[in-house]
Each structure stands twice: as C-alpha cells, then as structure tokens.
Amino acid sequence: MEPLLESPATFDIFGIPTVIFSVLIPVAAVALFAYIIAKRLAPIVKARPDFRFDRPAERVKNILKIWLAQWRQPRYMMAGVLHIIIFFGFLILSVRSTELVIKGISADFVFPGLNTFLGDIYYLLKDYAATAVFFAVVIAAIRRGIFKPERYQYTEAYPHDHTWEAMLVLFFIAALMVSESLFEAAHVAAQVQAGVQPDFLAPATLGWFFKNLLVDESHAMLQNLHILSYYVHDIVFFTFLCFLPMGKHFHVITSIFNVYFMRLEKGNIRPVRYGVSEEEL
C-alpha cells in the first residue's frame, strides 16, 4: 500500500495536527456515552431483583436463533429482509468502523489477521456489506417517508410519531456507509493516478463507484476528501452511538442482552407495585 495521501494521523490544518481531533472526538464521545448509559441503567439497578442467569444453554440458543439468525424478522417480509441486511451489515462493518477510529491515531493500524488472506476476504465482504446496507437504508427511508405502511401509523392510543427518529437513524447509517466508502475511494484513486498497484475495491460497490468518479480529480481534491470523509465518519459514528440510548432505537445496543435475559417461561410476569417510596426501592 503506497501512502500517497496523508492520513488523519499525520495531516494538519493550518498547522494544527488533525490527530488531536482523532483523540478528542472518541474520548469525549465515550465519556458522554458512559454518562448516558449510567442514567439509563439507574432505574434498572433500583428495580426488584429477577434472577435470569438460569439455564445458560437455552439462553445461548436464543441468542443464536433470535438475535444472530434474526428468526422473527421475516414476519413482516419487506421490513424484515431490510432489517436483516442492515443487521448483518452492521456486524461486518463494526470491525471496519473500529479500525478507522484507531487509524486516525495510528495510520498503519490493522487488526491482527487482517493483513493476511483473511483481510482480503473481510474487506471484500465489507465493501459489499456497505453497499447492501446503503441501498437497504434508501429503500427503508422511501417506505417510511413516502409509502408509510399502515402499521407505522399512529392512533389516538399511540399519538407519538417516531418517523423523524427513524429517518434520522437511517440518515446516520447512510452517512456512515458513504463516508467510509469515500475515505477509501479517494486513496485508491490517488494510487491509480500515481500508476502504482491500487488497493482492491470490490466491483459494483460504493467504494468502486466513488473511485471511478474521483480518478480524474486533482491530488489536492483527493487529499481533502480523504480527510473530510474520515472526520464525517468519526463524528457521525459517535453521534449515532450517543443518540441511540435516548430513543426507541436503543435496542440496537440492548437487543443481545434483552434476548439472553428474556423470560423462558410464559405467564410469570410479576405485577407492578405502585406507591413504592424511594426508601423502599
């Protein structure tokens, strides 16, 4: 890999090293995320204990079936398929997103094993996953914003419309896919211009499309786009992370825990106790 473009770890703007932002953004975001999670967990910590560590084998089976295999999603076929694409795309791309955060501090960082043939397989899957997720998000946004399926409509019993939140989440996801693809495409386009062996981009993917679009742009343009797309990805990634616990999409984080600790027997929900004082909690 030829370092034809400066990375966020070595670049500077008006004499200010951008690596400062590469450190400050995740540190501030993780601190804020920890604070938000602590606030969300406070009521659970005060709640009556309910032992859910029994039958671990059955609980692991539920994780594999309900969470990982997305067993229940095809109940609503179109929405279910889109959800499955986005879910598995996120699982695949989580490694790349984490890698990018670290690359902003250490330009040559690669997760162990990804500098071998396993990396070739992973990055191929990553390119197609990002593209599939992007188009799934576009279709989901069109369904939610234009066609508006009946089950998304809110009645007097459920008057709060969460369409804005769903659209914002879809925007965050699309922005992550586009910015990651642009970051890589700008670098590969610079390699092509220099006549060196370019890094492989899977055909018919977002990165491949952007590379073909950018290959005739100036070196300065590619450099600026490389840096800009990195920090767009960084800011959107951590903004999304901190936004999730504050809305209905908190399940993106909690779903694996919800499934593991789900009730294994029906009809054993404890009744709500009203009028409990702070001291009795």
Positions of PLM-derived features:
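Membrane-embedded alpha-helical bundles of multi-pass integral membrane proteins
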Residues: 2-281
